[in-house]
Structure formats: structure tokens, C-alpha cells
């Protein structure tokens, strides 16, 4: 099924082990020159590419939810990603009529850090007792495409929880303390 593909995009849960398994299985099927894109919102590409047999062809391609409404796609270069892989990925993203931006390889990249703060503060305000309508109206009035609570809902709490728990594991593996926010506490209560 994948043999003739020039570029594939893996879009499984934000879980390093699952992504590593999918990478190995997919790379066994695609050509040596095919681009392997990982749709991840938080996991650094250089780390994911360690599971690739050809890290020069490995790149991050982060779509935003809801995909059909969000024009932006983050392209994330890993430490070993080639310029040719970047060029092919830019062409692909433009062909599907999305707007590509190339961002640094760091946990959360650019937009997940910005939107995480935006939605997290919306949820924190909710936890403080501010009425949801006030939070949502303020979000809309700033010119954002979606209000913070609506965006949290559109992204899906279960997905956000998976991202958060993987990020927490990564912090712990690095010997760092994970910052517990009001958003984390509320998600934990709602999802667990």
C-alpha cells in the first residue's frame, strides 16, 4: 500500500513507543527516498528520528485541529533532516493548500506552546469561577479564530491529556519537575 509513496505522514497518538513502532513498520514498506512525516504537536523530532533508519528523510508535519478549518501547518526539522526533505515537505504542504511555517525543534514547537498557554489560561479562569461566556467573548474579541474553551473542546480533552501525560513522562525522564497548572489539574479530574 505504501510502496509508491513519495511522502507519508504518521498521525498516531503522542506516544513515543507507538510512533517508533509505526516508523519501523512504515519504513520497511516505503522507498529509500520517501519522506517520513510525523504529525506531532509536542514530541521533539530529533528524538523521534532516532527510531528511523533514515533520519535525513524524517521531518515533523504538525496539522492543527480541526484540520479542515485550520490553514497552518508547522514543519519541524530534526537535527539530521535534509534540506531536500524540507523542500519536498514544503511543496506537499502548499499542494494541499495549507500555509507552512518552519519552526525550531523543541517540545511543543511554536504553536502548541502558544495555544497551550491560551487554552490553559482559559481553563484556569474557569477554575477561578469566571463565567464561560465572559472567557469565550474575550477570546473572540482578541481576534483569535476560536475562543479558548471552544478550542480546548475542538482539540479534544482526551488528546490533550495524552499529550500532557507524555510530556510529563519526558520531563521526569530528563530529571525535570513537570509544572502542574490549573489546566493539568482539571484535565486530570475530567479524564482520569
Model-identified regions with their sequence ranges:
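N-terminal glycine-rich phosphate-binding loop for ADP-containing cofactors
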Residues: 1-192
Amino acid at each position: 500500500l505504501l510502496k509508491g509513496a513519495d511522502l507519508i505522514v504518521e498521525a498516531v497518538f503522542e506516544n513515543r513507543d507507538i510512533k517508533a513502532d509505526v516508523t519501523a513498520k512504515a519504513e520497511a514498506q516505503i522507498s529509500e527516498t520517501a519522506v517520513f512525516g510525523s504529525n506531532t504537536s509536542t514530541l521533539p523530532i530529533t528524538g523521534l528520528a532516532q527510531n528511523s533508519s533514515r533520519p535525513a528523510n524524517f521531518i515533523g508535519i504538525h496539522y492543527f485541529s480541526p484540520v479542515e478549518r485550520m490553514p497552518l501547518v508547522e514543519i519541524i526539522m530534526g537535527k539530521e533532516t535534509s534540506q531536500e526533505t524540507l523542500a519536498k515537505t514544503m511543496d506537499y504542504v502548499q499542494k494541499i493548500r495549507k500555509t507552512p511555517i518552519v519552526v525550531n525543534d523543541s517540545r511543543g514547537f511554536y504553536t502548541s506552546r502558544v495555544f497551550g498557554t491560551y487554552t490553559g489560561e482559559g481553563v484556569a479562569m474557569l477554575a477561578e469561577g469566571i463565567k464561560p461566556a465572559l472567557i469565550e467573548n474575550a477570546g473572540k474579541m482578541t481576534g483569535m479564530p476560536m475562543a479558548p474553551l471552544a478550542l480546548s473542546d475542538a482539540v479534544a480533552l482526551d488528546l490533550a491529556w495524552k499529550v500532557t501525560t507524555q510530556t510529563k513522562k519526558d520531563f521526569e525522564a530528563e530529571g525535570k519537575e513537570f509544572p502542574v497548572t490549573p489546566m493539568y489539574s482539571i484535565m486530570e479530574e475530567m479524564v482520569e
